[in-house]
Amino acid sequence: MGFLQPGHTRPRICCPACCHARCKACGERGERGAVHRACNFKRRTAAVHHRTRPAVLQQYRPAPVESEAWRKAPPSSDRCKNARIFHHGPAGTVEYWSIFGEKKGALRASGSVRALTSTPRGYVVATDQGLWRVRTDTLNSTPDKTQAGKTAKQHQAPVPVRISTQRSCVALFATENMLIALFADGAVRAYDADGENELFSLTLPCTFSSAAQCRVQGDEIVLSDTARAITLSAGGALKWNISLYETPFTPLITTDGLVVSAGGWVLNAYRAETRLIDHTPIYNRDSYFHVLGSSRRAHVQEAPPSRPAAPAKRSPYDSIFSSDPFFSSPAPAKNSGKTDNAQETHTTSPPGPYATPELLLQAVQTSLKEGNVGPREPAYARSLHALLTSPHHARARAPAVTSARRAQAATLLGALGAHEYRDALLELLKEQDYTVLEGILKGLTRCTFGLDERALLALYRVTRAKDARAESLMRAACDALAACARSAPRTLSEKAVSELSRISTGAFPYTIRAYARTLVQSMLR
């Protein structure tokens, strides 16, 4: 093989027996690629010569890797950019190397090494005996004279300090100012950057594996594992926890809260969003109180006659309940009489935009069709829910509330698409009116089914009832089962398909069995 040629900044391939420009055995200069047969040094003695190679050649020597089980953990700050950490899991050996191939230290762990990460002042090791913190910035090198008269460096062994006795650590993550340890039983422990002080500790209702990932986004800590995505606050409070499909791929969490996972051939996306439930402005106006047993309003303090009270402003975020006469008390008749102790001043409610249920349902349907629901969604949802849950109260205020309009309200409530609307519809599945029940099933079809079995069990109660023979009702139930089979997790999807298959071959009318069979065939295609 060739020697190091003079005049070149990057060394060429050197002789395996020595590291000088001329061979010590023959003293001849060889060319690149030539083999020196006169060299008396064997390959087994090459390691002895290479130990004393000049430092200029060590920076081109690759990092020593004994097996494929070695893993490298990158440094977590600028103070440890001049070092790399390698660990050998099966043997339980941890070694600390510099980027120039110089061994800084070694540690023999009791048991196998489960996880390892670097810190600004050293590294943290997770073994079968717990978590260990090792400081490498305080190690001093002392010169030692060898027999050949050459100076070599003798390194002091690092002293590990146990910071936790919990033995099931599966992953370690180091950020700029925090060290996070994940355990197999769902425990999460956070320490400072050096691993000296514990910041918080909590146990989540899940399990972690070695495929877990961690990311710090602003003041939030985002954790992801197989079929699991979690968001924690900087203080350790649980903010978001969702179970995803069982998949070998770890979910991806983006900066805007979007979680993407792969389940089979399906790519799923979830987004953690915040909905505006209510916003009620407070105005500086006189106080009112309601007289029990009467719908009249008594004024506490009358406005001065020279300065009449200004009409209250209406906000687009106000709920329809507060301004719609369909849901408010009827306007009392004008009366100028006086009571024995005080004079009552009667006021009427301002006219609302939806005086009848038809106008309300038409407005919600138009907003959904045009896609401009916006901040009116809480008001729409409350009005539709009140129309469903308080039929007697609604009929007393407006006799035009019928079963068909209540069914349409249930369908529109499910079309709004929020998860909390699904729970409201599931509570109303005990309705005895088939028309309203059909509307509730249509609303569930357009709403999210979630990851639990509540919706599927509720559909079972409808399809397996003794009097479940109405064609329109069973068609709506089949549509809901098909929607559950398309959007629910795999276990719930299989149960929904099995229920559709049972309906297609059960004791139902021919039209219902044919409709269920068509849905199953469309899903199979």
Swiss-Prot record:
It comes from the Bacteria. Residues 139-149, 336-349 have a biased composition (Polar residues). InterPro entries: ARM-like (IPR011989), Quinoprotein_ADH-like_sf (IPR011047). Residues 139-158, 330-356 are annotated as: Disordered. This is Uncharacterized protein TP_0487. It comes from Treponema pallidum (strain Nichols).
